[in-house]
Amino acid sequence: MVLSATDKSNVKAAWGKVGGNAPAYGAEALERMFLSFPTTKTYFPHFDLSHGSAQVKAHGEKVANALTKAVGHLDDLPGTLSDLSDLHAHKLRVDPVNFKLLSHTLLVTLAAHLPSDFTPAVHASLDKFLANVSTVLTSKYR
């Protein structure tokens, strides 16, 4: 799914509003995912998955940093996320459906924190962006 110029602008503007809250929002999205989709916990058997866990916060920050990097390279997501794609496909062997689940909980988190900025157009653009990120992260599973 190709991001239009409007999509790219919406994604950059929305992520700009996230700003320094990105690590906290990443952790919150992970917590939402673990609560809403308990099977996702199986990929984190060594984590303390309780609310406010330092491990969840640290992984949320990794997720947020990867997305921030992706937002800065919207025209080269495959090149930008290649290492993460290798990691998730070959070492971690994460079921591809989990990227969709995290994308969903991230959208919910952003909508909750940025209600006036989370217009239908921004929602659609962020959804397309996260779908593209998910596609790239699962591209090396074949």
Curated annotation (Swiss-Prot):
GO terms for cellular component: blood microparticle; haptoglobin-hemoglobin complex; hemoglobin complex. The modification Phosphoserine is found at residues 4, 36, 50, 103, 125, 139. Keywords: Acetylation, Heme, Iron, Metal-binding, Oxygen transport, Phosphoprotein, Transport. Pfam families: Globin. The modification Phosphotyrosine is found at residue 25. Heme b binds at residue 88. InterPro entries: Globin (IPR000971), Globin-like_sf (IPR009050), Globin/Proto (IPR012292), Hemoglobin_a-typ (IPR002338), Hemoglobin_oxygen_transport (IPR050056), Hemoglobin_pi (IPR002339). CDD domains: Hb-alpha-like. Heterotetramer of two alpha chains and two beta chains. This is Hemoglobin subunit alpha. It comes from Alces alces alces. The gene is HBA.
